[in-house]
């Protein structure tokens, strides 16, 4: 994560509305790889409508936590409750159907497909069944959802371009558009500003603020300025366990957090 402790230059989550009740909860969530506890007894709760950061040094368990939430990994023990239903151990496609979507640390798009095709494939994945009578209406609905997702991330004007022709920042935002096309209630963003220029980072922060009006967002992010400016609350992981939770102001003044960051 680097040696810089969390700092704050502005109030967090500028322009954000109020949060609501719990949409995601984990109870004693643990996962072991041999004798290594990648996550240990993680009790976590995210509220509807909030932007929530998961931070910590490299190897703290951040990506493992996302992998458990999205069905990439099956927890060794514990429970995951999403929108009132237990989803522990479900496969990724089933969790996506429940309303959880994810972007990845490494850009995960189809470079030889158009921008529109990338998003349309994701929109189509939400269809449970097909029949000849409904086929035409279903296609129109899928296309409309794809256009809405592209409009949300500012890429509708580049819908017919090949994804490989987009800038790095645009490709990262396309991945967010792909996630939005699945109509999630919870969006997990893994390093959304990684490798971006300052201008691209600012555009992505504005994008996250816009889309957060309609869903809950969890962010794993190494750029502490991004975290402090965007998020309502922050959870700090260290060696697979929760070290601290709180507002940006509380986290940046937490002695335990400062000690961990200054030692990395």
Label each PLM-derived region with a short phrase:
Residues 5:
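Cationic, low-complexity basic patches in intrinsically disordered or flexible, solvent-exposed regions
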Residues 2, 12-264:
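Glycine-rich phosphate-binding loops of nucleotide-dependent enzymes
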